[in-house]
Amino acid sequence: MYTRIALALGLLPLLFTTARGQQDVKPIVQNTTAVKFQKLPNLPDCITAAVEQGDPTNGPSVLMVKGGTGCSAPWHFHTPNEQLMMISGTGRVEMKGEHPVTLRAGGFAYAPVKHVHEFTCMGGPCSFFLHSDGPFDIHYVDQNGNEIPAEQALSKRHK
């Protein structure tokens, strides 16, 4: 009995902290004209992104990403989990060890922590939402899975 009471009292502050934290979160409703697209470090020049929610340098975030025709982010991984949902155009996603999948508007992809994958805009420009559950980063790899500098990975790609 005393154990249950102690446990309940120990968890009580968490309930209030969670509720208080949720109250601090403000809703967001906006059109794309309100966001500013810019180049992100270590990504191909053909990719721009706008922050929809959060701060990609410090924690979870949602980005709206645009890529030009044939634009490709070569084999890479991220330290956080990543979710992608196509808005427009066609994107080709290939997860290491899987067959490539062509995504159209509404298509979805999920890459768990450090899962190597590649993305290419096919047949024209494309746009997609990218959700990261931690600070956004990108680590490129060679054909053997060894990490390589962004400059090396992007040197032979469409910029």
Specify the residue positions occupied by each region the protein language model found.
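A short, N-terminal "cap"/entry segment at the start of jelly-roll beta-barrel domains
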Residues: R20-S61, N144-K159
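N-terminal post-signal-peptidase region of extra-cytosolic proteins
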Residues: I47-E52, L63-C71, S88
